[in-house]
Amino acid sequence: MTEVTELSRPEGEALNTREVLLNLGPQHPSTHGVLRLVLELDGEFVERVDPHIGYLHRGTEKLAESFTYTQIFPLTDRLDYLCPPSNNLAFALAVEKLLGIEAPIRAQYIRVMMAELARISGHLLITGALPMDLGAMTALLYVMREREMIMDLLEMITGARMHTSFCRVGGVREDLPDGFFPKIREFCDIFPNRIRDYERLLEDNRVFLNRTKGIGVISAEDAVDLGLSGPNLRASGVDWDIRRDEPYEIYDRLDFNVITRDEGDCYARWRCRVDEMRESIGIIKQCIDQMPEGPFQIDMPTIAFPLDKDRVHCSMEALIQHFDLSAYGFKVPKGEVYSAIEAPKGELGFYIISDGSPKPFRMKVRAPSFVNLQALFGVTNARYLADMIAVLGSLDPVMAEVDK
């Protein structure tokens, strides 16, 4: 393993510096979106960082109050737009909890399989983007090759590459298409070797290791105090994963490991995501092998569209059902609920208040990127300006999810 050189701040009067303010972003290729950081610098050392957010605010939570529950799914696509199936799933589970229903088992397997594909897709991007931010572009070209395969699979299932809107309350929009299983098995067979390619590119790269190891360290205590979740939490040694500790859907039927590391630095956060992709492949394989027969949508005319779409053209009852759900939606009992999943970025939760109408009275999104961004306050003190790029990239925020 290549030796990592530790950088330290010069002491005494070796350098004559003065404090300056520097704007990093909102238009900067390494801020991962429209994030503006106002940095207080003493020479090259960051004394303070002040994030300015809101450049991508679209009012998702307020818009939801004017939409029926089914119409909200496209809004959730645009939170973490790298992983729409996870956003769809989190929202669907919250509404189903209010209704007191569960999706059919086949639909749950399909949902989990798509959520893990989304996890791999999201982790792939930061696996290549973090090295690219630090000057090693080759890794990004490698990961985009495999990410294109995932986009093809999502397009095969949903008809869309990014904004899938595939989940529905009580199931999924439609069943898996013919020819899907051979395609996803092929991907599962190829992908583990491709992960090893990424590791060979970067594990002995002296520049990458110097720029990530020992940089941006977050202790386990600080990670918990800041409310971090997902790989950013587990990279600090906190063994917590909602899929295992508060299982939803069929995760309690699946065998997988929760990846943790103790270092809490930029490299540990990058490494956690790489190793999690292997676990996701194992989960997808189990979903394929265990996939049961049965309906992909709950059979409740007051909530779900007709399972047989052809009936809409020849049955007055089915036509009325389809029209009512499309035009007016379905009513949800009065109450409030919070439901969370383990999204690629961390704990993604939806808090919904229902007043008994077909539209939520209030919806609050617990976006993991928003919470994880707080870590910038605690990890950049007296570090080089160049380290800011590594720290921000390793936290892997998506600004659409931060600003909502």
UniProtKB/Swiss-Prot annotation:
Query: Which UniProt keyword terms apply here?
Result: Cell inner membrane, Cell membrane, Membrane, NAD, Quinone, Translocase, Transport, Ubiquinone
Its EC number(s) = 7.1.1.-
The topology of this chain with respect to the membrane is: Peripheral membrane protein
Cited InterPro entries = NADH_Q_OxRdtase_suD, NDH1_su_D/H, NiFe-Hase_large
Q: Which SUPFAM superfamilies match?
A: HydB/Nqo4-like
Coiled-coil annotated residue ranges, if any = none
Compartment annotation: Cell inner membrane
Any one GO cellular component localisation term in the record: plasma membrane
Query: What GO molecular function terms would the record report?
Result: NAD binding; NADH:ubiquinone reductase (non-electrogenic) activity; quinone binding
Instruction: Check the record and name the Pfam families matching this protein.
Output: Complex1_49kDa (PF00346)
Write out the function statement from the record.
NDH-1 shuttles electrons from NADH, via FMN and iron-sulfur (Fe-S) centers, to quinones in the respiratory chain. The immediate electron acceptor for the enzyme in this species is believed to be ubiquinone. Couples the redox reaction to proton translocation (for every two electrons transferred, four hydrogen ions are translocated across the cytoplasmic membrane), and thus conserves the redox energy in a proton gradient.
Known partners and oligomeric status? NDH-1 is composed of 14 different subunits. Subunits NuoB, C, D, E, F, and G constitute the peripheral sector of the complex.
Q: By its UniProt entry, which HAMAP family does this protein fall under?
A: NDH1_NuoD (MF_01358)
What family classification does the UniProt entry report for this protein? Belongs to the complex I 49 kDa subunit family.
- Give the protein name, as stated in the record: NADH-quinone oxidoreductase subunit D 2
